[in-house]
Amino acid sequence: MSRAAVFSRQCFWRPIFIALLCLFAAACQTTRPVTSADAERVDLRLQLATAYLERGQPNVALTEAKRALEVDPSSARAFNIKALALMALQRVDAAKQAMQAAVALAPTDLSYQHNVAWLQCMSGDVEQALQAFDAVILRAVNDFNPAQTHLSLGVCAIQAKRFELAERALRQAVVDARYANAANFGLATLMVQSENWPAAVRYLASMSPAYRVSPEVLNLQMHIDAQYDRMQQAPADGMNPSAFN
């Protein structure tokens, strides 16, 4: 398996890595008056959309977000969820349009700025995304936790092969329990990139048992195990199998 295959751009779209995305904003912004009943309908639709997105069902999430927008066409949160669903479906242009709508409706909400940066990263504008993540971290205030942005910055930096930046960012994210599993996976991936197999094993072992059985983690573990096997078979090449123990 090639190193590029170890860390694909889509791997974090799986439900266990939804931590990379800001699903909820600090508030539910809207620019037009809505009745209490309508607000409840929108909230219910978006709760459903979020749940479907977390379960890896972006098509259904997109439908629910669209239904929310039928009730309130100026809901920034609905445009945000719509954009994330479109991102998961790899409909990049449509996702950008929806995210731009969310930002236009709530320009001061750092959650949406975070997601704009992630969309840039996933669509190939990696350097621009890194700058955008930095801007979000610099602007972080009391109601916005920068640990999530450090996590996404680290993942994006891996895409740019900015490994030192990636490691610094992921180490800042790993201290937050909510993002520790995804950050440890990112750090393990970094260690595989640098062929530091013992460290990669340690980071994978730091993940919770439920996360360690995900397809992405098992795939990375298999890659590491293959290195164990090669070292056992060819110690004369300078490899030391005991380094993994």
Please name every model-derived segment.
Residues 54-55, 88-89, 122-123, 155-159, ...:
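Register position in tetratricopeptide repeats
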Residues 33, 39, 197, 201-245:
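Terminal, low-structured helical/coil segments at or just beyond the last alpha-helical repeat
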Residues 47, 81, 115, 152, ...:
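Canonical tetratricopeptide repeat
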Residues 44, 78, 112, 146-149, ...:
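TPR alpha-solenoid repeat register
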Residues 37, 71, 105, 139-142, ...:
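Structural marker of alpha-solenoid helical repeat scaffolds
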Residues 22-44:
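Bacterial Sec signal peptide processing site at the extreme N-terminus
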